[in-house]
A protein has these predicted regions:
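A residue-level marker of the well-folded mature domains of exported/periplasmic proteins
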Residues: 3-4, 25-324
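Bacterial N-terminal signal peptides that target proteins for export
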Residues: 2-12
Length: 324
């Protein structure tokens, strides 16, 4: 009888050991498909690197899907359809167009694949969480900063993003609210540069031909701010320039005195938190339904915080990240 009890005891210990090991085996190697809008905007490269860092920390696997043509609706739709067939464990999704990609979100939802919406908030759909920042507040605070530096007066031009893109709409809306607060500011023009450096350069060159005196430039992202600076340098003209995204290129321009400031969009951290949220949800750990980073402005007084190249950064632990 004692021998039998010992055998039962050994069997129970074996079962406990196997059961105890099962969760750890299950809690690794999750496959996460990450969708971003293009390969031309340094911001989205920061998002992808943040996603990679989070995956490494959590022992998950990330695959990136990026349209070869920037912001291509048909291409992203095709990529979504291909990914659904592959059945990843989760998807992190930035729609190239917040309205046009709603059918893609519906297909993901229909396939029962959990999805985290990051950066550009989708017009509709079912999501584990949203991770991003308030584009309106970034536009407002960066606009206020520019106007204050202009002394509350002078001529201002705006370089908008992609026409119809919610990020551009909200950032420009925030800037316009800041302009309303400053009666001494004259808004000369507001034209799209489609979030592209070269297009912004060309738009800025045309604006300088039409307007002999431009005191300030509000660019809806850092790439367009860089284009505006290049145009100003080429014409040997001066103006205060701000952008949004907090990219390394913008930090370098601020450090060099070429750019006034940039609104920090926290691209690396958006990638970190989006993948962390997706993986934690798969592991049945608590997640936050909304993770919205505060609107902060990076200038010559605090640019040091963004000097570390995104390639050299690591995601913080979840517990530390949600405290900030």
């Amino acid at each position: 009888m004692k021998a039998n009890m010992k055998m039962v005891g050994r069997c129970m210990l074996a079962v406990i050991a196997v059961c105890g090991a099962a969760p750890s085996l299950a809690q690794s190697g999750e496959r996460v498909a990450v969708f971003t809008k293009n390969q031309t905007n340094p911001f989205f490269q920061a998002v992808r690197l943040g996603a990679d860092s989070a995956a490494k920390q959590l022992n998950a696997k990330v695959t990136h899907y990026v349209p070869t043509k920037p912001d291509s609706i048909p291409e992203q739709m095709s990529q979504v359809e291909d990914v659904i067939v592959k059945k990843p464990d989760a998807i992190v999704f930035t729609p190239v167009d917040y309205k046009a990609m709603v059918p893609a979100v519906a297909k993901i939802n229909g396939a029962k694949i959990p999805v985290v919406n990051v950066t550009d908030r989708s017009d509709s759909g079912s999501f584990v969480a949203f991770v991003g920042a308030s584009d309106y507040k970034l536009g407002l605070e960066t606009g206020r900063y520019l106007i204050k530096a202009m002394g509350g007066k002078g001529n201002l031009v705006v370089l908008e993003g992609v026409k119809g893109a919610l990020t551009s709409i909200d950032r420009v809306r925030g800037l316009n609210e800041a302009v309303k607060e400053a009666p001494g500011i004259k808004l000369l023009a507001s034209q799209p540069g489609n979030y592209q450096r070269l297009q912004a350069l060309q738009v800025m060159e045309n604006l300088m031909q039409s307007h002999p005196k431009i005191d300030g430039v509000f660019a809806a992202n850092d790439a367009m701010a860089a284009g505006a600076i290049e145009a100003l340098d080429g014409a040997n003209r001066k103006a205060l320039v701000v952008g949004i995204n907090g990219t390394k290129e913008a930090i370098d321009a601020i450090k060099a005195g070429k750019m006034l400031a940039t609104g920090d969009y926290n691209g690396f951290m958006q990638g970190c938190m989006a993948v962390m949220t997706a993986v934690r949800d798969l592991r049945k750990l608590p997640v936050q339904k909304e993770i919205v980073f505060p609107a902060t402005v990076i200038d010559k007084t605090n640019y040091q915080q963004g000097e570390t190249p995104v390639e050299s950064r690591s995601c913080p632990k979840w517990e530390d990240a949600v405290k900030t």
